[in-house]
């Protein structure tokens, strides 16, 4: 959203004024000047309007909006460096425009200028009005949390997502992001609480986001060695509808859970599905080797283990299984 569009959205009569001022004939310049003065007076009296001040004229806003639109097009076409220049120019013209700074943060992030992006996102949040931009600020809290998590700053990530949830406990994206943060630091119980709360807010029918959260919940159950929970959580997921990496994750978690419940044939079936997608998947071949070993199918276990070590000679679990196979009965 452009700065001038933000004004039109939040100031009722500005919705009609913006197109009208473009149509006014030249002979009405005096009336226009009076009207602009009136608009400036009214806008400056509104506590929530952070985009307009006596130092920023409507002409400046319009020019900045045109520059910002140019930045939008450059960003969409992947010309991030030039887009950043446009957004910086627009931001300099309207120092209180939080929206262009939000775009600038995304552009810096696309350029891998991570710390600059985080700093700019904080500036956008500071400029946003707590009441008028309440939902927008909450979204930005979550985005800032994601940025910090991506660069490994877990404490700051948790700080920002907590702020979003404090303001809106039912904010779905915030619950999902906090779940991922807590999962990262292995606070599995707390992560499950957020993930399950997020699932309760989602529609029952399957969606890409719901499946993604279900996979993360199953992953935690897998870490906790709770195979029955893994199978229950993934039972409604059809791997054929997923991207290959997601499908492999689901098959692998199912296979491990089935092996642990001694449903060996079903486990092998899941692992074979993985090898169709990726014949060189070392972890799948290891689980296959361990499944055959538990079945007492020694020859197949040894052959599968040899494949694992060919793909990854330093696979820790495979090396332990190799020692176990070599030890006297």
Question: Which functions belong to the PLM regions below?
Answer:
Residues 48-102, 110-119, 329:
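N-terminal leader/linker segments that initiate helical-solenoid repeat arrays
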Residues 103, 136-143, 177, 216, ...:
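Canonical tetratricopeptide repeat
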Residues 89-92, 126, 163-166, 200, ...:
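Conserved structural position within tetratricopeptide repeats
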Residues 57, 63-65, 98-99, 132, ...:
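Helix-start (N-cap) detector for alpha-helical repeat units in TPR-like alpha-solenoids
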Residues 76, 110-111, 150, 184-185, ...:
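Register position in tetratricopeptide repeats
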């Amino acid at each position: 959203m452009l700065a001038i569009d933000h004004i039109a959205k939040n100031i009722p009569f500005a919705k009609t004024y913006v197109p009208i001022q473009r149509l006014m004939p030249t002979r009405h310049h005096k009336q226009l000047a009076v009207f602009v003065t009136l608009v400036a007076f009214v806008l400056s009296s509104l506590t929530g309007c952070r985009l307009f001040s006596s130092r920023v004229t409507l002409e400046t806003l319009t020019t900045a909006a045109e520059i910002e639109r140019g930045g939008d097009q450059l960003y969409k076409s992947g010309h991030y460096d030039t887009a950043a220049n446009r957004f910086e120019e627009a931001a300099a013209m309207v120092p209180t425009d939080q929206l262009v700074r939000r775009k600038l943060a995304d552009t810096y992030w696309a350029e891998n200028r991570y710390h600059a992006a985080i700093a700019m996102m904080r500036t956008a949040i500071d400029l946003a009005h707590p009441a008028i931009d309440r939902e927008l600020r909450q979204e930005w809290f979550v985005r800032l949390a994601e940025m910090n998590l991506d660069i490994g700053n877990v404490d700051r990530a948790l700080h920002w997502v907590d702020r979003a949830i404090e303001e809106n406990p039912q904010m779905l994206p915030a619950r999902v992001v906090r779940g991922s943060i807590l999962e990262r630091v292995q606070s599995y119980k707390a992560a499950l609480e957020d993930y399950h709360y997020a699932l309760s807010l989602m529609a029952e029918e399957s969606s890409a986001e719901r499946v993604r959260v279900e996979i993360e919940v199953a992953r935690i159950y897998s870490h906790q060695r709770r195979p029955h929970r893994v199978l229950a959580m993934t039972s409604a997921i059809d791997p054929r509808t997923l991207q290959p990496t997601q499908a492999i994750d689901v098959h692998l978690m199912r296979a491990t859970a089935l092996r642990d419940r001694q449903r060996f044939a079903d486990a092998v079936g899941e692992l074979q599905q993985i090898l169709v997608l990726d014949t060189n998947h070392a972890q799948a071949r290891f689980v296959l080797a361990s499944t055959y070993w538990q079945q007492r199918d020694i020859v197949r276990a040894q052959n599968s283990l040899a494949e694992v070590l060919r793909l990854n000679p330093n696979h820790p679990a495979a090396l332990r299984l190799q020692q176990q196979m070599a030890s006297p009965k």
